[in-house]
């Protein structure tokens, strides 16, 4: 008799059937991943790969996980945000016998305890690959090894509640695990593929400092990720989160978007299409000019604070909305964030004020003068905390890139140095091509003489690496 599978932590395993039905629906909308299974499945290019995955545990991610497994990988998974898990998706993955540790609304302590579980495999071994979103799994290994090698002063110098919890975890592991635990992890991991802008910044910082422990592929800067997921995904999912959280009429409202990168562009478009009058703030003169040329009013947060009804941060930076800004806002202004981390809004400065939880991930905060503010997802990702994240189709492009990156790193161990790389343009174009038929797109084909005239191959790539799209 086979032992019952218990290597998981989910909210309710009884949600597995519901999750499986939604996974089936999502597969229809994820042609890139399904084509990848068909093309690579017989070759089993990930056989022997043991992937530690830290990425929002959604229905779409379930399709990614099962694609990796179909290509031969063993997988352990956690969510990279305490509010982004879809519990029925996690249940379906657990019911399929895949270790997953993710609960929507988990505590920060649980979050980091679950992250530690990524690296403790049931056979006593370790992962040899990381698939990351935001860089927390990668940071776990790097900071753990730093402390293991004797540099422990930083463990007592936390700047946030989350850092305090994370550093306490490292201290505990150093006491409980055999000496050399983190060194073994670092040695065994052959590479990481990173999903998002914030995590990529961390990787480049470590590379620049000469501290990157293994090769990395920057999936975020694949064109078929950043110009689609970040832009068109946010265009659909931002207003979904605000509406589900507040039921507010968006048409006619004044909305303020901080940041006009790809996520900010998608967010501003989302609000404009909902009928909002949209303002934008920027530090980059190029992005500011882009926003102005798109017809947005470009102002500072100080200008917008007393005027706007809705505030969205999308910068990847810290302290974008300060306590002073919040004090200047209208009564019951709606404040949310769509950047990866929760420090864009100074939520910590609000802890001593009166909090009234209206429903999950929706809080009304009352200031001493009686003014109230609606905060969504405690300043964490609003589209995943208050809604279901990006639609399946756009995530198919991102996750096809992730799958190809995992194959590239695992199949070519020793080829890459401890640096950050991007996937070649030929693969970027391949990912796009896999998604065309689903939406009825018919490509024009170059004749040989036309291709020769512009100096490309008939089958592509069609653009130089420096082309910006």
From Swiss-Prot:
NAD(+) binds at residues 196-198, 230, 259-264, 282, 317, 338-340, 383. One of its GO terms (molecular function) is adenosylhomocysteinase activity. CDD domains: SAHH (cd00401). Substrate binds at residues 58, 133, 195, 225, 229. One of its GO terms (biological process) is one-carbon metabolic process. Its EC number is 3.13.2.1. It comes from the Bacteria. Keywords: Cytoplasm, Hydrolase, NAD, One-carbon metabolism. Binds 1 NAD(+) per subunit. GO terms for cellular component: cytosol. It is found in: Cytoplasm. It holds the Pfam family AdoHcyase_NAD. Its main location: cytoplasm. It catalyses: S-adenosyl-L-homocysteine + H2O = L-homocysteine + adenosine. Belongs to the adenosylhomocysteinase family. This is Adenosylhomocysteinase. It comes from Rhodopseudomonas palustris (strain TIE-1).
């Amino acid at each position: 008799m086979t032992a019952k599978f218990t290597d998981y932590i989910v909210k309710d395993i009884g949600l597995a059937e519901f999750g499986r039905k939604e996974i089936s629906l999502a597969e229809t909308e994820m042609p890139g991943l399904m084509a990848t299974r068909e093309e690579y499945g017989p070759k089993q290019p990930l056989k022997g790969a043991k992937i530690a995955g830290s990425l929002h545990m959604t229905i779409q991610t379930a399709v990614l996980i099962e694609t990796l497994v179909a290509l031969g990988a063993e997988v352990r998974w956690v969510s990279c945000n305490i509010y982004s898990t879809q519990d029925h998706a996690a249940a379906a993955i657990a019911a399929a016998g895949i270790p997953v540790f993710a609960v929507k609304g988990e505590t920060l302590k649980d979050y980091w305890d679950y992250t530690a579980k990524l690296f403790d495999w049931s056979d006593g071994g370790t992962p040899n690959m990381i698939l990351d979103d935001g860089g927390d799994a990668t940071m776990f290994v790097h900071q753990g090894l730093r402390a293991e090698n004797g540099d422990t002063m930083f463990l007592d110098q936390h700047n946030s509640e989350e850092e305090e919890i994370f550093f306490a975890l490292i201290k505990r592991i150093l006491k409980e695990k055999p000496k050399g635990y983190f060194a073994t992890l670092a040695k065994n991991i052959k590479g990481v593929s990173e999903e998002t802008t914030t995590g990529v910044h961390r990787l480049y910082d470590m590379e620049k400092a000469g501290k990157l422990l293994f090769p990395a592929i920057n999936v975020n800067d694949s064109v078929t990720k950043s110009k689609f997921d970040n832009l068109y995904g946010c265009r659909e999912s931002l207003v979904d989160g605000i509406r589900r959280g507040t039921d507010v009429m968006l048409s006619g409202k004044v909305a303020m978007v901080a940041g006009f990168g790809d996520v900010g562009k998608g967010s501003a478009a989302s609000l404009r299409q909902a009928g909002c009058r949209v303002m934008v703030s920027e530090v980059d003169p190029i992005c500011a000019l882009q926003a102005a040329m798109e017809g947005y009013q470009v102002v500072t947060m100080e200008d917008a604070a007393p005027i706007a009804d809705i505030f969205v941060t999308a910068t990847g930076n810290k302290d974008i909305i300060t306590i002073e800004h919040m004090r200047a806002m209208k009564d019951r202004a709606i404040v949310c964030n769509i950047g990866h981390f929760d420090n864009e809004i100074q939520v910590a400065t609000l802890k001593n004020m009166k909090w009234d939880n209206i429903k999950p991930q929706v809080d009304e905060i009352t200031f001493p003068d009686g003014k109230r503010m609606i905060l969504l997802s405690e300043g964490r990702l609003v589209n995943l905390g208050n809604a279901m994240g990006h639609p399946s189709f756009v995530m198919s492009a991102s996750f096809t890139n992730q799958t190809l990156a995992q194959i590239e790193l695992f199949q070519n161990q020793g080829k890459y140095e401890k640096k950050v790389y991007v996937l070649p343009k030929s693969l970027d174009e391949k990912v796009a091509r896999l998604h065309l038929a689903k939406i009825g797109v018919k490509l024009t084909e170059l004749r040989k003489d036309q291709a020769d005239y512009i100096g490309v191959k008939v089958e592509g790539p069609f653009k130089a690496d420096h082309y910006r799209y």
